[in-house]
Amino acid sequence: MARVTVEDCIDKVDNRFELVLLAGHRARQISQGAQITVDRDNDKNPVVALREIAEETLSPADLKEDLIHSLQKHVEVDEPEMASEFITHSSESESIFNTSSQEEGTSFDHMSEEELLAGIEGLVVPEKSDDY
């Protein structure tokens, strides 16, 4: 195959734009020292990449997966939740401070309506300023 055209590769990769992305990615791999799978024949890296795709020496699905992986900046890994670790830490803190979370959650100060009104009447209104 003296000349490689998009028509030679389009039956392997359906989308022309995806073909260009895959060939460009493979050409970068070749320029970084990756082993080529076809004869170079004094061709440049993009042509060699297209020839590899056309002759199916490389799987387009593998190239696509490698391209996606190379473009990812942050790979999120699903980790198991640490609910049991939180439970052990909270029980440790209860033993250290000799308190339980139930006692802290149920203690409220009770105030009658008269005490609340007396507290509100005792508030001083701040002077109005031109700051705002």
UniProtKB/Swiss-Prot annotation:
The protein's GO terms of the molecular function aspect are: DNA binding; DNA-directed RNA polymerase activity
The chain's disulfide connectivity reads: none
Q: Name one GO cellular component term.
A: DNA-directed RNA polymerase complex
Q: Name one GO biological process term.
A: DNA-templated transcription
Keyword entries, A-Z: DNA-directed RNA polymerase, Nucleotidyltransferase, Transcription, Transferase
State a single Pfam family of this protein. Answer: RNA_pol_Rpb6
Q: What is its EC number?
A: 2.7.7.6
Q: Where is this region: Disordered?
A: 89-109
Reaction(s) the record says it catalyses: RNA(n) + a ribonucleoside 5'-triphosphate = RNA(n+1) + diphosphate
Q: Which InterPro entries match?
A: DNA-dir_RNA_pol_omega (IPR003716), Pol_omega/Rpo6/RPB6 (IPR006110), RPB6/omega-like_sf (IPR036161)
Q: How does it assemble?
A: The RNAP catalytic core consists of 2 alpha, 1 beta, 1 beta' and 1 omega subunit. When a sigma factor is associated with the core the holoenzyme is formed, which can initiate transcription.
Q: What exactly does this protein do?
A: Promotes RNA polymerase assembly. Latches the N- and C-terminal regions of the beta' subunit thereby facilitating its interaction with the beta and alpha subunits.
Record protein name field: DNA-directed RNA polymerase subunit omega
Give the organism the record lists: Bartonella tribocorum (strain CIP 105476 / IBS 506)
Tell me the gene name: rpoZ
